[in-house]
């Protein structure tokens, strides 16, 4: 079954709020075998909403609406659909009682326009709103399925999970969609795609979809099958083929992120970490502390933005700063080694570079050095040549720090 999601609300068109409902619904619908081929956003206008309905009816089996179920005059979704389908709007007694009870409990006047929220399409299946007032509804008519949901995500999402998805399963074939995301770092999207292009072109089940984001690349493997075990086998076979070619850049699955993976390895190996941040200005340390229980492995950090701090706190020799510069391999080495000693950690990591937009020390923006000093191991400095905005260079530098830390921890 093919679906179209129609988000109703002028505030969406104006960019005042993001359409997170469409993302949530697309993912949920895909998981039960409903294909979403179109996303439409339309303002609070009866004529334009009617046009959107007519277009969607030509190309989709299921029309899913979010928004426009509230009490105000510009909440037109129910009225427009009722007119389009020649259906009456009737009061749902349970919803009306629930709304009335809310106003009594809060001591507010139950105005006539608020009763409007209890109106539903005659003959529709009503979805209770456990987190708001306006109920949702589903109606199967003229070979099409119409789903109406409230706009606020805090109301729509729990309604979907509790009531809408069980209703929708009546219209699916039983074939479900299963996905697995493979995460890679240290290789560009184009480089990775070249290495697996024949697999991307040749696969229909599962499919392979590459996506680049903030310096890393993901491959989403998606399989369709009625049986979860068979779907897992399909995905695993393709994953094995991919990792044979680019496994050296692979670091995790789905919602596993570099900083979490590095922290897990630190805990597993019983090692402690300290950081010296010039270029990144605390970004690395901030991401470290996003992980729960990290105090057992993270000693702390020094933000050494000014050369005085590099020299007098982290003891980078004056001649290094004068001759090689703060943005140099030598400076990164001293910073990593000395922050390790200063904070009595097993590992020291450092970041120095040029974030831009202007050059510094005759070095171009994106020139970065990441130092890594590990006890009983030779210090390593990783030179980077990054592109992007000032913020992107800083964020990608921190991510490269986690990547190199993770890879070194895997080796020792």
Curated annotation (Swiss-Prot):
InterPro entries: CinA, CinA-like_C, CinA_C, CinA_KH, Competence-induced_CinA, MoaB/Mog-like_dom_sf, MoaB/Mog_dom
Gene: cinA
Listed name of the protein: Putative competence-damage inducible protein
Sequence similarity: Belongs to the CinA family.
SMART domains: MoCF_biosynth (SM00852)
One protein family per Pfam: MoCF_biosynth
Origin organism lineage: Bacteria, Bacillati, Bacillota, Bacilli, Bacillales
HAMAP family xrefs: CinA_B
Organism: Bacillus anthracis
């Amino acid at each position: 079954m093919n679906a179209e999601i129609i988000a109703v609300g002028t505030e969406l068109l104006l960019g005042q709020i993001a359409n997170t409902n469409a993302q949530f619904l697309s993912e949920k619908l895909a998981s039960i075998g409903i294909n979403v081929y179109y996303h439409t956003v339309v303002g609070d206008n009866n004529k334009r909403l009617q046009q959107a309905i007519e277009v969607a009816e030509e190309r989709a089996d299921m029309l899913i609406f979010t928004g426009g179920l509230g009490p105000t005059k510009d909440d037109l979704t129910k009225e427009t659909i009722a007119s389009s389908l020649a259906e009456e709007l009737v009061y749902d007694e349970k919803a009306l009682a629930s709304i009335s009870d809310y106003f009594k409990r809060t001591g507010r006047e139950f105005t006539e326009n608020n009763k409007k929220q209890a109106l539903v399409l005659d003959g529709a299946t009503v979805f209770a709103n456990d987190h708001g007032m306006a109920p949702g509804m589903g109606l199967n008519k003229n070979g099409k399925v119409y789903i109406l949901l409230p706009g606020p995500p805090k109301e729509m999402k729990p309604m979907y999970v509790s009531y809408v998805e069980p209703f929708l399963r009546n219209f699916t074939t039983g074939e479900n969609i299963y996905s697995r995301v493979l995460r890679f770092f240290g290789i560009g999207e184009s480089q990775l795609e070249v290495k697996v292009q024949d697999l991307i072109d040749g696969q229909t089940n599962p499919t392979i979809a590459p996506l680049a984001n903030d310096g890393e690349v993901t491959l989403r493997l998606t399989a369709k099958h009625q049986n979860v075990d068979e779907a897992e086998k399909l995905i695993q076979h393709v994953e094995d083929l991919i990792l044979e070619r680019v496994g050296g850049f692979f670091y995790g699955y789905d919602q596993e992120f570099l900083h979490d993976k590095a922290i897990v390895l630190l805990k597993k190996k019983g090692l402690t970490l300290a950081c010296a941040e010039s270029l990144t200005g605390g970004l690395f340390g901030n991401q470290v502390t996003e992980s729960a229980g990290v105090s057992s492995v993270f000693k702390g950090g020094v933000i050494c933005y000014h050369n005085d701090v590099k020299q007098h706190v982290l003891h980078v020799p004056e001649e290094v700063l004068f001759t090689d510069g703060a943005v140099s391999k030598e400076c990164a080495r001293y910073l990593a080694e000395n922050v390790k000693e200063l904070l009595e950690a097993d590992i020291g990591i450092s970041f120095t570079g040029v974030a831009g937009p202007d050059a510094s020390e005759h070095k171009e923006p994106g020139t970065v050095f990441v130092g890594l000093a590990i006890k009983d191991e030779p210090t390593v400095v990783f030179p980077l040549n990054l592109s992007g905005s000032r913020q992107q260079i800083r964020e990608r530098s921190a991510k490269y720090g986690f990547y190199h830390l993770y890879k070194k921890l895997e080796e020792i």
